[in-house]
């Protein structure tokens, strides 16, 4: 049971963060950097992203109380939001919430350290990823549950680091067509996850649906 939940967490976060699709963005941002510099940036971005997502996992319930957020409403809203990202992925488009605006891209190129922004936020730990983590933590308080989500986060972040570290190699082996196929597959998986979140939220808001 716990293993299947960890797999669910991993698939959900992997699909919404889409580390494979972010490889071209990483290569663009680190153009002109040495392999060692790229590795250092990828490592720092991964560590920061892990702590950001872990913070939302641990303190998510406090955010619920502070803003009087209904758990079921969050699942519906988060599901709709994530479905929007899935729709863009299915059409091989970049999600606006995870892609860079012109000013952000220009600013990131002028800075020596891009690991905090835009890599950690919004590329790795973007709104969709944060919403997914908060939804997964909603309504649960057991240590085992939090540990399972934390393991899922760590696994996705570790894979993201590896994809960034070997980004040049991956880009040379996978053409644009292959990248689009993978992106659409991630979109399909994410759409299924989003529909499940919306369904769970609606059942919680309207118990009559379960009768």
UniProtKB/Swiss-Prot annotation:
Where found? Cell membrane
Report the domain of life of the source organism: Bacteria
- For this UniProt record, give its keywords in alphabetical order, as a comma-separated list: Cell membrane, Membrane, Transmembrane, Transmembrane helix
Mention any one GO cellular component term assigned to this protein in its UniProt record: plasma membrane
- Keyword Transmembrane tagged: yes
**Species name for this entry?**
Bacillus subtilis (strain 168)
Mainly resides where? membrane
Q: Which family does it belong to?
A: Belongs to the UPF0056 (MarC) family.
Task: Identify this protein by name.
Answer: UPF0056 membrane protein YvbG
Q: Name one Pfam family in it.
A: MarC
Q: Where are the transmembrane segments?
A: 1-21, 47-67, 69-89, 114-134, 150-170, 188-208
Bilayer topology: Multi-pass membrane protein
Identify the gene encoding this protein.
yvbG
Q: Which InterPro entries match?
A: Multi_antbiot-R_MarC
């Amino acid at each position: 049971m716990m293993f299947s939940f960890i797999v669910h967490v991993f698939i959900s976060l992997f699909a919404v963060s889409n580390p494979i699709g972010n490889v071209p963005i990483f290569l663009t941002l680190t153009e002109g950097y040495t392999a060692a510099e790229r590795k250092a940036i990828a490592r720092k971005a991964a560590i920061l992203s892990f702590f950001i997502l872990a913070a939302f996992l641990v303190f998510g319930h406090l955010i619920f109380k502070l803003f009087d957020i209904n758990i079921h409403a969050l699942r519906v809203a988060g599901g709709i939001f994530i479905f929007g990202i899935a729709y863009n992925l299915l059409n091989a488009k970049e999600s606006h919430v995870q892609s860079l605006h012109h000013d952000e891209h220009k600013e990131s190129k002028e800075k020596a350290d891009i690991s905090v922004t835009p890599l950690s936020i919004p590329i790795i730990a973007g709104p969709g990823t944060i919403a997914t983590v908060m939804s997964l933590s909603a309504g649960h308080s057991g240590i085992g549950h939090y540990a399972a989500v934390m393991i899922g986060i760590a696994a996705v972040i570790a894979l993201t680091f590896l994809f960034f570290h070997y980004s040049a190699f991956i880009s040379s082996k996978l053409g644009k067509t292959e990248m689009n196929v993978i992106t659409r597959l991630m979109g399909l998986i994410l759409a299924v996850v989003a529909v499940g979140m919306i369904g769970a939220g609606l059942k919680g808001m309207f118990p009559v649906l379960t009768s």
